[in-house]
Swiss-Prot record:
The keyword Lyase applies. This is Membrane-bound lytic murein transglycosylase E. Belongs to the transglycosylase Slt family. It is an enzyme of class 4 (lyase). GO terms for molecular function: lyase activity. It catalyses: Exolytic cleavage of the (1->4)-beta-glycosidic linkage between N-acetylmuramic acid (MurNAc) and N-acetylglucosamine (GlcNAc) residues in peptidoglycan, from either the reducing or the non-reducing ends of the peptidoglycan chains, with concomitant formation of a 1,6-anhydrobond in the MurNAc residue. Murein-degrading enzyme. May play a role in recycling of muropeptides during cell elongation and/or cell division. One of its GO terms (biological process) is cell wall organization. Its EC number is 4.2.2.n1.
Length: 212
């Protein structure tokens, strides 16, 4: 019963935020499928809660967001590897997100594949990357909700790609985003953004986020 109530709440939440013209039958159908197929088992996710809490506090990142991203990215499988060579719980690409985190830490090179199969290292780097996206790369975005959505999209598809869809000038891109209301930003992601998978990814993450 509790799950049904939560599921209903999430649907209403997404409809409210996105506007009835934005949340199509297909999107709602996808969310229902996520609910029906149980995106990931909380019994599996429970294995990582202690580590999630540790790095949530270290990087000041919402533990619900970390949990949701792990759930959507890997279903809590430490051995998950994508076609694009993303590795582990938070599906870190060593040559992109991994290297970016190393750069901000003043380190050379990138994490090894072996490192990224380690749950603690993987969640450390993944959560650090979320922090970098939110507090460094996207820091000029004023609305906290839009910043959350932009961070989630950037985690999966890159901040540079998102910002360049508004302008190749980062300052101008952020100014354009800051002129948008929440519904306008979500409508842009759903209907105009060139990365068509971004909306589906955002929907999945927010779905789990509100169930955790």
């Amino acid at each position: 019963m509790k799950k049904v109530i939560l599921f209903t709440y999430v649907i209403i939440f997404l409809v409210f935020l996105s506007g009835y013209s934005v949340v199509t039958k297909n999107i709602v159908h996808n969310i229902k499928n996520n609910y029906k197929n149980n995106v990931c088992s909380m019994k599996v996710m429970h294995l990582w809660f202690k580590i999630i809490n540790l790095f949530s506090k270290k990087y000041n990142v919402d533990k619900k967001l970390i949990t949701a991203i792990i759930c959507v990215e890997s279903s809590g499988n430490t051995h998950a590897v994508s076609i694009s060579k993303a590795i582990g719980l938070m599906q870190i690409k060593p040559f992109s997100a991994g290297r970016e985190v190393y750069r901000f830490r003043g380190l050379l090179n990138q994490p090894s594949d072996v490192d990224l199969y380690d749950p603690k290292i993987n969640i450390d780097i993944g959560t650090s990357y979320i922090n970098i996206l939110r507090n460094k790369i996207l820091s000029g975005i004023k609305n906290s909700e839009i910043l959350l959505y932009a961070t989630i999209i950037s985690y999966a598809h890159g901040a540079s790609k998102l910002l360049k869809s508004f302008s190749y000038n980062k300052t101008l891109a952020i100014k354009k985003i800051n002129k948008m209301k929440i519904k306008e930003f979500l409508d842009y992601i759903h209907n105009k953004y060139s990365e068509k998978k971004a909306w589906d990814y955002l929907s999945k993450v927010m779905y789990v986020y509100h169930l955790v």
